[in-house]
């Protein structure tokens, strides 16, 4: 019907302003726009491609590709309303509208904390988490290198959940075996270091409590959390 035609036209217009190189896109197979195009059987685009070809690769955490952005605004809401960071916003109006940073500076020069939540909610491949997979495979292939891996405590159950195993299944043995099969020489467990960290933090908390400073004590091993404290609440950071 006419409603179906309208939705098809909207998808076609979105694709006209979108990079259509799906084969090399990290979101290939998991892209909402790709799924909608398949659902509504949009096989051709009648309009010229006007996608903006700007890639911001300055951050150590994420990559922003303007040619894939559909201006849905989910990343803006996540960054401003949920994470309270405010690194990205809407810029300009009309056909010139885009999602950018203050003064359109590289994301590395903003208050971005590298939490990655914008990439988590992006329905297409406009914001993606940086991958070092190619570097890892290159290191494994180099016989002159000894390649080691370090596994965080939470990974032993998170991998199992990702593979649809029962909640809480410990797959550390399978994970180590798989890494050795890949060519990784040594695998280290971070659990011991985590235990030592807990002991140090407990001692620091007891000392902090004895001084009666009246200030809270926060601790985290997450780089994003630490950057958030440094950039947004610097008076609490020591």
Language-model features: where?
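Fe-S ferredoxin-like electron-transfer domains
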Residues: 1-2, 6-114, 120, 127-128, ...
């Amino acid at each position: 019907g006419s409603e179906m035609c309208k939705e098809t036209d909207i998808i076609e217009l979105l694709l006209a302003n979108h990079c259509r190189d799906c084969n090399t896109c990290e979101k290939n197979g998991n892209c909402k726009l790709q799924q909608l195009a398949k659902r509504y059987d949009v096989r051709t685009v009648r309009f010229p491609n006007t996608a903006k070809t700007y890639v911001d690769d300055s951050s150590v955490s994420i990559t922003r590709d303007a040619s894939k952005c559909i201006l849905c605004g989910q990343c803006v809401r996540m960054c401003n309303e949920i994470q309270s960071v405010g690194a990205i916003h809407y810029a300009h109006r009309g056909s010139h509208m885009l999602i950018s940073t203050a003064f359109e500076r590289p994301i590395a020069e903003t208050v971005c904390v590298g939490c990655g939540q914008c990439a988590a909610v992006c329905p297409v491949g406009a914001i993606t988490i940086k991958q070092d997979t190619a570097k890892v495979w290159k290191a494994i292939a180099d016989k002159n290198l000894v390649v080691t891996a370090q596994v965080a405590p939470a990974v032993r159950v998170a991998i199992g959940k990702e593979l649809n195993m029962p909640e809480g299944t410990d797959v550390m043995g399978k994970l180590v075996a798989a890494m050795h099969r890949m060519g990784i020489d040594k695998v280290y467990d971070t659990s011991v270091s985590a235990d030592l960290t807990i002991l140090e933090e407990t001692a620091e908390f007891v000392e902090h409590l004895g001084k009666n400073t009246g200030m809270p004590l926060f601790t985290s091993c997450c780089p994003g959390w630490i950057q958030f404290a440094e950039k947004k609440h610097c008076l609490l950071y020591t």
